[in-house]
Amino acid sequence: MSEQPFWQQKTLDDMSDAEWESLCDGCGQCCLHKLMDEDTDEIYFTNVACRQLNIKTCQCRNYARRFEYEPDCIKLTRENLPTFEWLPPTCAYRLLAEGKPLPAWHPLLTGSKAAMHGERISVRHIAVPESTVVDWQDHILNLPDRAR
């Protein structure tokens, strides 16, 4: 009889730092810049990638030192997770916090990121480099509700 994976055995609070980090599927959606409406506080996703995001791999170029390079970079923690209502519906942190299973394409289930990229969950199909953007409002998009 096989043992259940850690994300089915533990709460988010009980996970080790390594387990917590491994939940990230590496889609890069957190690394897309967001715009906030000053009147309504509504958050809009853009397809504008952070300067540190390698769009092809959807990985941070300087993950260990990302806050030095990008002071506005998001640090998702167990404590602040509830404040990130904008996390995509496919986000493992959000799904597990809501008592939902990981989607079938998640790298922890498939062993690679290929299925995630194939399902077009990652941003590598839509992201543009920040250095090429003139008018950020032209890059507002609606991300699909793709949790599976």
From Swiss-Prot:
HAMAP family registered for this protein in UniProt: UPF0260
Name of protein: UPF0260 protein KPN78578_22800
Top-level taxonomy: Bacteria, Pseudomonadati, Pseudomonadota, Gammaproteobacteria, Enterobacterales
Family membership: Belongs to the UPF0260 family.
Highest taxon above the source species: Bacteria
